[in-house]
Amino acid sequence: KAEQWAKSFVNNLAKRPQGNDRAQVKAIYEGECDIALINNYYFGKLKFSEDPEQRKWVENVKLIFPNQGENDRGAHVNISGGGIAKYSKNKENALALLEFLTSEKAQKLYGEINFEYPVNPKVLPSLELQKWGEFREDNLPIIKIAELGPLSQKIIDRVGW
């Protein structure tokens, strides 16, 4: 089923994706395609860019979250992880850094400056993120994504993605 989906996806590409997230938004703006996949925080970076050309791109596209139907799984959410090496010589400071990064103060900054959603449940998304609307996130465990990685890569290779 996944391979058929991937094959259909590839067959519907207006063009082979090239460049970064910004390039995908520009491609929509220039009429090269009607839809693209990007990390949402680039939408905010473009919207508030110092480059008026980039602001123009984002003013002419709409951000949507996929898989939001009643029986859909929700949108995939990227995560950033942190850890402490087993033999770290500075575990206390490493732990203090991780605790700060997940603190209310740091999580608010991530949202306001980098347009990222908070991982700390005590922190609301920034006002800009709230303007984009609510969405249901996919709750597939990250370990399952990791387990399916090698098979996913084989499928991608077979369908010429």
Walk through the language-model features, giving the residues of each.
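Short helix-loop capping/hinge motifs at secondary-structure junctions, enriched
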Residues: 1, 88-94
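Ligand-binding pocket segment of bilobal, Venus flytrap-like solute-binding proteins
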Residues: 1-66
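Solvent-exposed, polar/charged alpha-helical surfaces in well-ordered, non-transmembrane soluble domains
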Residues: 7, 22, 26, 30, ...
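Structured segments of extracytoplasmic/periplasmic soluble domains
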Residues: 12, 27, 31, 46-49, ...
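Solvent-exposed loop/turn segments at secondary-structure junctions
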Residues: 41-44, 68-72, 89, 103-107
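A contiguous binding-surface segment within folded domains or other stable secondary-structure elements
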Residues: 58-82
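A bilobed periplasmic-binding-protein/Venus flytrap-type ligand-binding module shared by bacterial periplasmic
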Residues: 77-90, 109-110
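Extracellular/periplasmic juxtamembrane helices and adjacent flexible linkers that interface
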Residues: 100, 104-161
